[in-house]
């Protein structure tokens, strides 16, 4: 696991597994009242155990958790902060309600396959659905929320305006090509990329759901590559970007072909 500060108020934690990212955002108001949100989660137990330590060492106090979408690897913050409320997009709230226990089952399958032991079963606890597009207050300002579906049927991206940071969920990854899940959609994915474009153009840092934080120039290059790839589907020769042309990504490409051709 790696933790890097991309701004005085923003720390990004990157898991050793799938390079899944977790973003910690802090904001203090002039009256001294401060708030802190943890967005998404790392994957491995020792990484989750370290999250409260990272927050404490920064001198911050957790206000709540947020998730970009309802895939299980983004919902593990409850292990680190068992009493914190979890905020999500209304689409994610609907997904979780419609598929109770899905995240827990998929986590259990992952743990069994990879010999991972956890202290207890995953409990999502209190989940608050947020209107998206919209905003959520933090300190004396707000985080911006943007719909981000296409990878899955649900999701949101978040912007930290004063820090110039965009947390985009499973989009614009330097290590993963666009992945259309069973509930995903090429058209919705392309629409999300276009919604993200103006945010990325104004950003200092973009935090993808998987991979290291990247600057705006690289994020825009990835966006162009991803648009070209998606628009070429279902052509089997759709251009997988050279930097992401690995065996694992070719498997994702094969899944995408089946989804788009169905």
Predicted feature descriptions by range:
Residues 23-24, 38-39, 48, 62, ...:
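Conserved N-terminal glycine/acidic-rich loop preference
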């Amino acid at each position: 696991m790696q933790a890097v500060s991309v701004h005085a108020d923003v720390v990004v934690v990157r898991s050793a597994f799938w390079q899944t990212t977790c973003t910690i955002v802090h904001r203090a108001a002039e009256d001294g009242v401060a708030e802190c949100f943890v967005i998404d989660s790392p994957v491995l137990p020792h990484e989750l155990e370290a999250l409260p330590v990272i927050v404490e060492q920064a001198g911050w106090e957790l206000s709540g958790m947020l998730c970009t979408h309802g895939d299980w690897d983004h919902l593990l913050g409850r292990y680190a902060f068992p009493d914190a409320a979890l905020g999500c997009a209304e689409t994610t709230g609907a997904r979780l309600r419609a598929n109770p226990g899905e995240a827990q089952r998929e986590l259990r399958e992952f743990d069994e396959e990879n010999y991972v032991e956890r202290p207890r079963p995953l409990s999502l606890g209190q989940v608050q659905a947020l209107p998206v597009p919209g905003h959520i207050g933090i300190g004396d300002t707000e985080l911006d929320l943007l719909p981000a579906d296409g990878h899955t049927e649900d999701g949101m991206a978040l912007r930290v305006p004063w820090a110039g940071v965009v947390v985009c969920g499973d989009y614009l990854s330097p290590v993963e090509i666009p992945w259309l899940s069973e509930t995903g959609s090429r058209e919705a994915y392309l629409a999300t990329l276009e919604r993200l474009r103006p945010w990325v153009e104004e950003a200092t840092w973009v935090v993808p759901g998987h991979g290291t934080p990247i600057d705006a120039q690289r994020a825009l290059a990835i966006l162009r590559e991803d648009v070209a790839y998606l628009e070429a589907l279902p052509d089997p020769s759709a251009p997988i970007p050279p930097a992401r042309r690995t065996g694992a990504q070719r498997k994702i490409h094969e899944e995408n072909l089946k989804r788009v051709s169905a």
